[in-house]
């Protein structure tokens, strides 16, 4: 039986570090962010719908989607954000499911669905176990400011636009505390995977 793990966390909590650790253990990772980029490539059904709803001003000169521009359009406009989600989410869900089924058919021990907005997008039904990568609020803020060159105000707004991390922690099957060293994170992951009988 393939165990389907939903990997999530707050923005800048270090989820991609954990995602990489799964890959190093030869456990396949299906990345929602990569799929979200692929489903809106020029000519795909979701791309055509976005142009229909948002107009050509969200396109680059070469006709590809201008993601930062679209991002700023929806970030401060709830109605438009919901419209965009209605287009993108079903396409992402369908592709993630397709890849997941493929790995299950191959008889993989486990497969990871790396979904930043697992709870917000109501995708928990796609997975068997939920693993949340968590950090203390000040660590999250510092990392986000450093990583994205954000001012404190901007970083705080991004963090607050997601479900609070402590809420995600409450709904998790297991939690990795990512405030410490890489080695510490790796050890926590191994303990969890042994508990779930995924590794020996």
UniProtKB/Swiss-Prot annotation:
Localization in the cell: Cytoplasm
Catalyzed reactions per annotation: 3'-dephospho-CoA + ATP = ADP + CoA + H(+)
Chief localisation class: cytoplasm
Keyword set, alphabetical order: ATP-binding, Coenzyme A biosynthesis, Cytoplasm, Kinase, Nucleotide-binding, Transferase
Pathway participation: Cofactor biosynthesis; coenzyme A biosynthesis; CoA from (R)-pantothenate: step 5/5
Entry-linked InterPro entries: Depp_CoAkinase, P-loop_NTPase
Coiled coil: none
Binding site for ATP: 12-17
UniProt family annotation: Belongs to the CoaE family.
Name of the protein in its database record: Dephospho-CoA kinase
Organism this protein belongs to: Bacillus cereus (strain ATCC 14579 / DSM 31 / CCUG 7414 / JCM 2152 / NBRC 15305 / NCIMB 9373 / NCTC 2599 / NRRL B-3711)
């Amino acid at each position: 039986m393939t165990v389907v793990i939903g990997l999530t966390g707050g923005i800048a909590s270090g989820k991609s570090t954990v995602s990489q650790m799964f890959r190093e253990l030869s456990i396949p990772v299906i990345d929602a962010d990569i799929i979200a980029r692929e489903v809106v490539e020029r000519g795909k059904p979701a791309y055509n719908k976005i142009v229909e709803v948002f107009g050509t001003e969200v396109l680059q000169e070469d006709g590809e989607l201008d993601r930062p521009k679209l991002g700023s359009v929806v970030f401060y406009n709830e109605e438009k954000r919901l419209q965009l989600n209605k287009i993108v989410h079903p396409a992402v869900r369908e592709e993630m499911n397709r890849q997941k089924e493929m790995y299950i058919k191959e008889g993989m021990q486990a497969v990871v669905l790396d979904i930043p907005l697992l709870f917000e997008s109501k995708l928990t039904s796609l997975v068997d176990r939920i693993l949340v990568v968590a950090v203390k609020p000040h660590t999250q803020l510092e990392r986000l400011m450093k990583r994205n060159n954000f001012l404190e105000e901007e970083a705080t707004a991004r963090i607050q636009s997601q479900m609070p991390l402590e809420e995600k922690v409450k709904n998790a099957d297991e939690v990795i505390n990512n405030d410490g060293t890489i080695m510490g994170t790796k050890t926590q992951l191994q303990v969890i995977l042994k508990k779930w009988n995924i590794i020996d």
